[in-house]
C-alpha cells in the first residue's frame, strides 16, 4: 500500500507543470468531478472527528483509494503557484467549471441557474481566492512545506480508522487544515479549468 511519505513521494510526485496537469486532469475530471472530491474529503474529515465509520456505507478501500488520489492532487499543486489572476469583470462560468460540468448544467437548464453555481462552483474559496487561486496555493505552501502537508494528510487518512480520539485539544487546528485541503482542491481545479494545456 502506498501509504508512507517516502513511497508516495516516488509514486505520486510530478516533475513539472505538464505532469501536474496530466495528474489533475485524471483525478479531477476522469475519475470523478470536483463536488465528489470535496465530499470524499468531508467523509475522511467526518471519520477523523467522529471515530465511528459506517463501513456499510463507506468501505475502507474507498477511504484509502480516495485519500491516495487526493495525495496526487497535493503533489501536483506545488507546480501551480505562478498563474495570473482573473479580473472580476471578466470572470465567467468557463472560469469556474470544466466543459463536462457546463454541459451537465445546460442539460438541466438552458440558462445558468444560481442553484447550479452553488452546486458546482467553489464553496470554500473566498472571492479573492477564486480570482487568484495561485495566490492561495502559494500561501498554502508558505504556511507549511509540501513534505509537512503530505505527512499531515497521511496522518488524517490513518486517523480515519481510529476508534479513540487523538485530538488532545487540537480540534481547531485539524478543522483548519481540512479546510485548507478543500481549498487546495478547489484552487487546483480552477487552475486546471483555466490553464490546462491538455
Where are these regions (language model features)?
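Sequence/structural signature of long amphipathic alpha-helices
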Residues: 1-198
Amino acid at each position: 500500500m502506498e501509504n508512507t511519505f517516502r513511497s508516495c513521494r516516488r509514486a505520486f510526485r510530478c516533475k513539472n507543470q505538464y505532469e501536474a496537469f496530466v495528474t489533475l486532469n485524471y483525478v479531477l475530471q476522469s475519475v470523478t468531478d470536483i463536488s465528489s472530491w470535496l465530499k470524499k474529503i468531508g467523509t475522511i474529515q467526518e471519520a477523523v472527528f467522529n471515530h465511528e465509520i459506517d463501513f456499510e456505507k463507506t468501505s475502507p478501500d474507498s477511504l484509502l483509494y480516495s485519500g491516495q488520489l487526493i495525495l496526487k492532487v497535493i503533489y501536483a499543486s506545488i507546480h501551480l503557484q505562478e498563474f495570473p489572476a482573473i479580473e472580476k469583470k471578466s470572470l465567467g462560468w468557463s472560469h469556474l467549471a470544466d466543459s463536462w460540468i457546463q454541459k451537465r448544467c445546460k442539460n438541466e437548464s438552458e440558462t445558468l441557474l444560481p442553484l447550479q453555481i452553488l452546486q458546482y462552483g467553489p464553496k470554500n474559496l473566498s472571492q479573492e481566492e477564486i480570482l487568484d487561486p495561485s495566490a492561495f496555493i502559494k500561501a498554502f505552501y508558505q504556511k507549511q512545506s509540501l513534505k509537512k502537508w503530505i505527512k499531515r494528510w497521511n496522518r488524517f487518512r490513518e486517523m480515519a480508522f481510529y476508534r479513540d480520539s487523538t485530538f488532545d485539544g487540537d480540534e481547531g487546528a485539524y478543522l483548519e487544515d481540512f479546510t485548507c485541503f478543500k481549498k487546495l482542491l478547489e484552487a487546483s481545479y480552477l487552475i486546471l479549468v483555466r490553464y490546462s494545456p491538455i
